[in-house]
């Protein structure tokens, strides 16, 4: 079995497709939910925004503030993927997907400034199809995550709290 495949995920599609974990070198920015009127544009590059700082996944933005583990807030994660990692070819029949093992709580995924998908709640994995939004060269993924409490009886965390995989399906 290839080393890139997590031992806890013995699903057939991991063996039939090309998968690559993309947990490193994300950029992150958090703001209170009350400031949603000033949220980022899905086309805004985080590299030029001083509010962003580098993080690796998995990431929980609530855990750093032990005084307020139920802070209503939203986070923005951005990753630019080079053509070395995602060699998109428009003439190919290959399909590209992002597989999220877990994002808490509600999230929307943008690819190159266009909404590619969304997922509500956070205790299940999901996939987002990238192919219709990809371009040759670098591609930018932006994940907007909203956390609003109360939503559970225990600490649930907030953010992309599990691995993210880039998946190529022939």
Segments the model singles out, each with a brief description of its role:
Residues 55, 63-69:
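Surface-exposed, low-complexity/disordered Ser/Thr/Gly/Pro/Asn-rich loops and linkers
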Residues 8, 12, 18-20, 27-33, ...:
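Accessory beta-strand-rich segments of carbohydrate-active enzymes
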Residues 25-56:
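Predominantly extracellular/luminal regions of secreted and cell-surface proteins
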Residues 49-51, 64, 75:
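A generic, residue-level signal for flexible/boundary positions that often mark functional hotspots
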């Amino acid at each position: 079995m290839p080393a890139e495949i997590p031992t806890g995920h013995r699903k057939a599609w991991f063996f039939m497709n090309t998968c690559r974990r993309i947990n490193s070198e994300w950029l992150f920015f958090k703001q209170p939910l009350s400031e949603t009127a000033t949220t980022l544009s899905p086309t805004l590059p985080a590299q030029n925004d001083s509010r962003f700082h580098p993080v690796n996944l998995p990431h929980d933005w609530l855990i750093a503030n032990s005084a307020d583990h139920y802070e209503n807030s939203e986070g923005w994660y951005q990753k630019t993927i080079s053509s070395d990692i995602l060699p998109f070819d428009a003439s190919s029949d290959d399909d590209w997907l992002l597989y999220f093992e877990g994002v808490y709580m509600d999230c929307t995924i943008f690819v190159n400034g266009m909404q590619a998908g969304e997922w509500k709640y956070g205790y299940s994995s999901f996939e987002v199809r990238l192919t219709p939004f990809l371009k040759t060269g670098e591609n930018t993924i932006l994940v907007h995550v909203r956390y609003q409490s109360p939503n559970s009886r225990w600490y649930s965390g907030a953010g992309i709290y599990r691995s993210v995989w880039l998946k190529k399906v022939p």
